[in-house]
Regions:
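A conserved mid-protein helix/loop that constitutes part of the nucleotide-sugar donor-binding site
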Residues: 32, 211, 215-234, 240, ...
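Nucleotide-activated donor-binding/catalytic signature segment of Leloir-type glycosyltransferases, i.e.
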Residues: 16, 257-273
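Aromatic "clamp/platform" in nucleotide-sugar-dependent glycosyltransferases that forms part
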Residues: 294
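A short, histidine- and acid-enriched strand-loop-helix "catalytic/donor-clamping" loop
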Residues: 130-148, 160-163
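Short alpha-helical donor nucleotide-sugar binding micro-motif in glycosyltransferases
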Residues: 273-274, 281-286
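Short hydrophobic beta-strand element within catalytic cores of glycosyltransferases
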Residues: 311-315
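Conserved acidic donor-binding segment of nucleotide-sugar-dependent glycosyltransferases
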Residues: 326-337, 344-349
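Donor nucleotide-sugar binding/catalytic pocket of nucleotide-sugar-dependent glycosyltransferases
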Residues: 154, 159-200
């Protein structure tokens, strides 16, 4: 990005606005976007602690940004469907955001959910007349069973917040149902740091028989892995031969391995979750990625496979599906017959390679957000030197 064009003809007279980014944790996939934001903005990342199901994530440092971990609590919650555990998530409660915003006096705030953290950001923006963006990823599918209290909070946030950033088309559709005007929504695209996948990498696996069918994701019911195993078993009963590799950890890992044994699946391999930068070698081992999620706000594994040149069979319930894939690559994992037919096409090599041009790079997404923030901050900014709070800035890390 041409920073002079973004912040004016004389950047020495117009310093970067300080922008506080409020997040649960610093996700490795966001590293590229955050780096680009930090080139145009004085970026301060305020984050909570590492979630215990993400311990395989490596330390993340965002060049050009400062950051601080906010003390607080994490509540581990289980989402249930039809009386059974469907997924697990963490509720973050970090009251320290209030103090950090008041002391740091950022020129703008970006927050990535519709809960406590966003209410704090909106309160700060209202009291100090600063713009606040809510960065949102939920879809009509993922939010279909939101409870009464969360619906109430979202009504408050939807009326209060005037600026929004959405993960993509399906997230925008959900925001519109909350009564948020389309002109208030900056639609970007959820993305990964593509530089990891552009670098050469030797395949991590050399398995036979081919093709190698890959699944990457947490071992929980909501990811559709049991449905994948049943569909694979039916194809093997038809006489098709292929290898299946599943990469990930989760509370259902033992249960799924037991199911694979009960189905008498051949050539199936389970691998524990890998550090993000190790994943390009796994994608380069694969002939096709199967993404059978029952609900996902986006599905960054699809981006990763596309960048690796691997065809993708994608669930219709993934937020990324209509934006990244043609209809022949999209299926309903809840329909067993449709799943079997789609997986048969994938195993026979009948899926087209996804179009990389549909992906937005981390630079494009970072520039879209930065330019929007700069445009809103320009009339408000002062050329007086900023007085920094008497605190020590930490490196921005994920734990």
């Amino acid at each position: 990005m041409n920073q002079n064009n973004a912040i004016g003809s004389n950047p020495l007279l117009m310093p970067k606005p300080r922008v506080a980014l409020l997040v649960n944790l610093v996700a490795p996939s966001r590293e590229g976007v955050y780096k680009h934001l930090a080139t145009a903005l004085d970026l301060l990342i305020l984050h909570g602690g590492m979630e215990r199901n993400r311990t395989y994530w490596s330390r993340v440092e965002v060049n050009g940004a400062s950051g601080r971990r906010i003390a607080g609590w994490q509540l581990s919650l289980t989402k249930r469907e039809r009386g059974e555990a469907f997924d697990h998530w963490f509720l973050h409660l970090e009251p320290g955001y209030i103090n950090e915003l008041v002391r740091g006096q950022p020129d703008a705030v970006i927050t990535d959910e519709m809960g406590f953290r966003t209410l704090v950001g909106l309160a700060y923006g209202t009291c100090f007349r600063k713009p606040v963006w809510v960065w949102w990823g939920g879809t009509l599918r993922t939010e279909r069973r939101v409870g009464y209290f969360r619906r109430l909070v979202r009504k408050v946030v939807a009326r209060w917040a005037k600026r929004w950033i959405s993960y993509g088309r399906t997230s925008t559709e959900y925001l519109l149902t909350l009564g948020i005007p389309r002109e208030r929504i900056l639609q970007v695209q959820n993305c990964v740091d593509e530089t990891w996948y552009e670098a050469p990498a030797e395949p991590a696996l050399n398995l036979r028989p081919r093709p190698l069918v890959l699944h990457v994701g947490r071992m929980v019911a909501g990811k559709g892995i049991a449905e994948l195993l049943r569909a694979a078993a039916r194809l093997q009963q038809e006489g098709l031969t292929f290898s299946t590799v599943l990469v990930g950890d989760g509370c259902d890992s033992t249960k799924l391995q037991r199911l694979a044994a009960e189905l008498r699946l051949d050539n199936i391999h389970f691998h524990s979750a890998q550090p993000p930068k190790a994943m390009p070698a796994f994608y380069r081992s694969a002939d096709v990625l199967i993404f059978p999620t029952m609900e996902d706000v986006w599905g960054l594994v699809a981006n990763e496979a596309i960048l690796s040149g691997v065809p993708v069979l994608c669930s219709r319930y993934a937020g990324c599906a209509p934006e990244l894939f043609d209809p022949e690559c999209i299926f309903d994992p809840a329909d067993e017959e449709q799943f079997v037919a789609a997986l048969r096409r994938a195993v026979r090599g009948q899926l087209p390679r996804a179009d990389k041009s549909r992906l937005r790079s981390s630079a494009e997404v970072g520039d879209l957000i930065a330019n929007t923030v700069l445009a809103s901050c320009a009339p408000r900014r002062s050329t007086k030197p900023r007085v920094e709070p008497d605190t020590v800035q930490d490196s921005v890390v994920s734990n």
